[in-house]
């Protein structure tokens, strides 16, 4: 199997925390960072290990910002995004491929010492912190007409947000342009973000998450879908849970 960017980010965060715990170096001031469209499994890993997790916008300048504002107060221990970018240390303020390659090799060696493969480690993480399947849909709309279409799509989503996704009830709507969070009970909160961004997120009662944003570099709008399956318990569950999650994703795409 090919391990995707969400899975590598998940393994990086898991290993960094486990290694620090083993060495007695995990501190209350340590923190991780992930982009808002990256898997929520990382949030579970951080939560269960009492490590602060910060969500930021897509792009490593936002991860670098979190490092900068915490210098001398808290320690950054890792951060990344769903598209394979990761920064395991705080010296470089951008995605660091060489360091990430070294880290994944270290993780593979660590797993091998335990008689495991990276796949075995992935399954172990899912069993402990919950299974999720992520899928990105890119809708390409070239030219000025396409740009207008994408703009209208976002306008329509704001005017008529979905009430259900693939049969699951939407219970929370986040709008990073208005910096508002709306809940199904009618309550409204403010989003604590450093700037506005043209991103929408919808969360369902079964922890399905869908994020929508126009690409900043290409003529397309991107839909990031994440589906959970709490029935995942062991390696034998992987194919079944993946197939069920893909069925759910297909239902959401419709």
Could you tell me what each predicted segment is?
Residues 1, 19-213, 220-224, 231-238, ...:
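Phosphate-binding and adjacent anionic-ligand microenvironments
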Residues 1-20:
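Cysteine protease catalytic core and zymogen-processing segment of caspase-like enzymes
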């Amino acid at each position: 199997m090919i391990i995707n960017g969400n899975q590598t980010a998940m393994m990086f965060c898991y290993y960094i925390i486990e290694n620090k715990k083993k060495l007695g170096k995990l501190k209350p001031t340590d923190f991780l960072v992930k982009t808002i469209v990256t898997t929520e499994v990382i949030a579970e890993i951080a939560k269960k290990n009492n490590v602060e997790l910060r969500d930021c916008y897509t792009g490593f300048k936002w991860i670098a910002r979190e490092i900068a504002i915490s210098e001398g107060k808290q320690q950054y221990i890792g951060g990344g995004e769903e598209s394979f970018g990761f920064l395991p240390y705080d010296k470089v303020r951008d995605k660091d491929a060489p360091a990430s390659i070294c880290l994944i090799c270290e993780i593979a060696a660590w797993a091998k010492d335990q008689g495991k493969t990276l796949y075995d480690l992935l399954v172990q993480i899912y069993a402990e912190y919950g299974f999720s399947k992520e899928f990105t849909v890119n809708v390409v709309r070239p030219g000025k007409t396409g740009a207008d279409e994408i703009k209208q799509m976002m306008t329509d989503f704001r005017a008529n947000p979905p009430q259900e996704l693939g049969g699951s009830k939407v219970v929370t709507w986040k709008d990073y342009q208005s910096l508002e969070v709306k809940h199904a009970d009618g309550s409204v909160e403010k989003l604590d973000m450093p700037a506005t961004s043209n991103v929408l997120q919808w969360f369902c009662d079964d922890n399905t998450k869908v994020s929508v944003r126009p690409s900043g570099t290409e003529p397309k709008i991107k839909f990031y879908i994440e589906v959970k399956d709490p029935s995942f318990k062991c390696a034998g569950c992987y194919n079944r849970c993946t197939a069920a999650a893909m069925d759910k994703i297909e239902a959401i795409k419709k």
